[in-house]
Amino acid sequence: MEIVNLLHFKNRSELRQWLEENHDKEKCCWVVTYRSKCPPEWPAIPYIEVVEEALCFGWIDSTLKRLPDGRLAQRLSPRRPKSHWTQLNMDRCEDLEDRGLMTEAGRQAFESSCKQVSEN
């Protein structure tokens, strides 16, 4: 899978602003991230914050790739209506809602998944 639309954010609020402006327009993006300690010369957002912000807008993380310079790129895309939700992501959505971070787009994606689970 080719890395297209690679985005660099210094902090979570920059990613959130991008998602606010693009969650209903873009088909995907790749976000520079890290899973352990990030060197100071590579400002990036921690993986968990990338995942949480994606969920807030009804998006999901998928493929993780290492960039040539050693950094990581996480692919994000809008969640498909009938996609499977892990219990971990459902718990995260409830926590994000409690913290006042969920958007209407994120709520709709989450409620759609809850409806499917209850129907099965």
Enumerate the language-model features and the residues they cover:
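Charge-dense, helix-prone N-terminal extensions
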Residues: 1-120
